Amino acid sequence: MKVISSIQELRDQLRGQNRAAFVPTMGNLHEGHLSLMRLARQHGDPVVASIFVNRLQFGPNEDFDKYPRTLQEDIEKLQSEGVYVLFAPSERDMYPEPQEYRVEPPHDLGDILEGEFRPGFFKGVCTVVMKLFSCAQPRVAVFGKKDYQQLMIVRRMVQQFALPIDIVPAETVRAEDGLALSSRNRYLSPDERAEAPVLYRTLHDVRDTVLGGDRASADLLAVEARARAALEQRGWKPDYVAIRKRVDLQAPTREEFLAGEPLVILTAAKLGATRLIDNLEI
């Protein structure tokens, strides 16, 4: 595996590779990330990964400097997965001058859910992903469903800019007890780690309530409120539990709900000092 930090060197290395499959990450890799590499291999060749901790997507209360950086361990993991090139630029490589141009997602998708609680986050994500796409010029890019809203935003960005890239969604990888794998899990205390699977069970409870009752009399806002209250009773601090349409992450109308519109339940909640997100499609 070749490790590259220069944008020009990356382009030179990939020249003529018109089937490249790309997996962007911020490093600190775990099994969930590695599953993305394996899926990428099924959809393209060669597999190209990136590791870049993107300052633009960190808010004022989010510590960019404390984000775990484990490059050597990450390199070993990617080598074992047969990744062809790792693009690991420095901040100077990616932003040699102030990044004055930004890619801002539409407000109806970028300012809800995660966007409401992390202002500017998706603007930072879209800007760096667009730049990474420009650097790697892949045919395929793989994004995990765990970051469901991010997946939707990147997919729409690719469509609206007519980028010749297929966005492939990857299923969330979970521990045996259901907790979604995340770099943030390392911050959980033993007691918090034992409690953490409750978040996924809450999503299942919401799904069972929605699917098990009479749709004509269902009150989705009340279902969401009860789920938030249940988490609060266990010591969580939920930002949201939201039942949304898969297609655009807007709340379904009663007519859409009764017609069987495909839905997804999304949640974000703090357990102690650690903020976890998860989702479940209905």
Curated annotation (Swiss-Prot):
Biological or metabolic pathway of the protein: Cofactor biosynthesis; (R)-pantothenate biosynthesis; (R)-pantothenate from (R)-pantoate and beta-alanine: step 1/1
GO terms of biological process kind: pantothenate biosynthetic process
EC number: 6.3.2.1
Residue numbers binding beta-alanine: 57
GO MF annotation terms: ATP binding; pantoate-beta-alanine ligase activity
Subcellular location: Cytoplasm
Residue sites binding (R)-pantoate per the record: 57, 150
Record field: catalytic activity: (R)-pantoate + beta-alanine + ATP = (R)-pantothenate + AMP + diphosphate + H(+)
Primary location recorded for the protein, binned into one broad class: cytoplasm
EC category name: ligase
Keywords, alphabetical: ATP-binding, Cytoplasm, Ligase, Nucleotide-binding, Pantothenate biosynthesis
Binding annotation for ATP: 26-33, 144-147, 173, 181-184
Superkingdom of this protein's organism: Bacteria
Pfam families: Pantoate_ligase (PF02569)
Keyword RNA-binding in record: no
Record has Disulfide bond as a keyword: no
PANTHER family attached to this UniProt entry: CYTIDYLATE KINASE/PANTOATE-BETA-ALANINE LIGASE (PTHR21299), PANTOATE--BETA-ALANINE LIGASE (PTHR21299:SF1)
Family that this chain belongs to: Belongs to the pantothenate synthetase family.
Function, as annotated: Catalyzes the condensation of pantoate with beta-alanine in an ATP-dependent reaction via a pantoyl-adenylate intermediate.
Binding partners and assembly: Homodimer.
Misc remark: The reaction proceeds by a bi uni uni bi ping pong mechanism.
Protein name in the entry: Pantothenate synthetase
Species in which this protein is naturally found: Cupriavidus taiwanensis (strain DSM 17343 / BCRC 17206 / CCUG 44338 / CIP 107171 / LMG 19424 / R1) (Ralstonia taiwanensis (strain LMG 19424))
Source organism phylogeny: Bacteria, Pseudomonadati, Pseudomonadota, Betaproteobacteria, Burkholderiales
